[in-house]
């Protein structure tokens, strides 16, 4: 039997640090941008599958009603995690509006504190993804733009190169279990939504709202 532990690490940078240190074997949901940055910095990781593609789930948000377009962000403070899909969306959105990355002041912080900083008025906008989008909307913030049409927003499944090379059977078993999970989600949608709500603490209606944002096809 194989003993499995499942640490909850939400930061892409911390996931790849754990891979590099050998304390983590598989990242079940790693931002594609984080994977590329880690590999370019010498981390021995291999992309073995796709967790999701979800451009609608990654957004730039503001609470100030006067900030409604990307151009309105010029000279403003934006909070969010650097070196991530969200950062990539910000740069792409600015470029699409003929603006440079330095047109805004990006303050690097994780998503929940970024949302809090925006809601408290400490920054003008925030890079927000997943359930935090709904949290921010319920607190009066609005979406300026999502990643749709800008990036694929691909979340990958990545593994340590050593695991791929020396323990391929373990990886095959993991990917088989992942595919079975996807099949269950598709076949038993109501049960899958209920389980997700219980596991995450999200309201059932929020799970239903967010589900269409994600494409969980695991094929690369």
Locations of the language-model features?
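Aromatic-anchored, glycine/proline-accented short structural segments
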Residues: 140-144, 157-159
């Amino acid at each position: 039997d194989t003993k499995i532990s499942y640490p909850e690490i939400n930061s892409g940078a911390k996931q790849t640090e754990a891979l590099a240190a050998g304390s983590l074997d598989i990242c079940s949901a790693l931002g594609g941008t984080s994977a590329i940055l880690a590999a370019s910095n010498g981390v021995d990781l291999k992309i073995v599958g796709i967790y999701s593609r979800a451009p609608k789930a990654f957004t730039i948000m503001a609470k100030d009603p006067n900030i409604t377009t990307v151009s309105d962000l010029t000279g403003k403070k934006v909070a969010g995690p650097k070196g991530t899909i969200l950062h990539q969306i910000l740069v792409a959105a600015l470029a699409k509006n003929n603006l440079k990355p330095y047109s805004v002041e990006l303050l690097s912080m994780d998503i929940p504190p970024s949302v809090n900083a925006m809601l408290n008025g400490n920054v003008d906008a925030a890079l927000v993804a997943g359930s935090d989008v709904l949290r921010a909307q319920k607190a009066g913030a609005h979406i300026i733009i999502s990643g749709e049409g800008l990036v694929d927003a691909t979340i990958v499944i990545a593994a340590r190169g050593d695991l791929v090379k020396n323990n391929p059977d373990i990886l095959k078993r993991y990917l088989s279990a992942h595919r079975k999970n996807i099949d269950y989600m598709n076949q038993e949608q109501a049960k899958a939504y209920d389980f997700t709500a219980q596991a995450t603490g999200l309201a059932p209606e929020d799970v239903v709202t967010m589900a269409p944002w994600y494409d969980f096809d695991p094929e690369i």
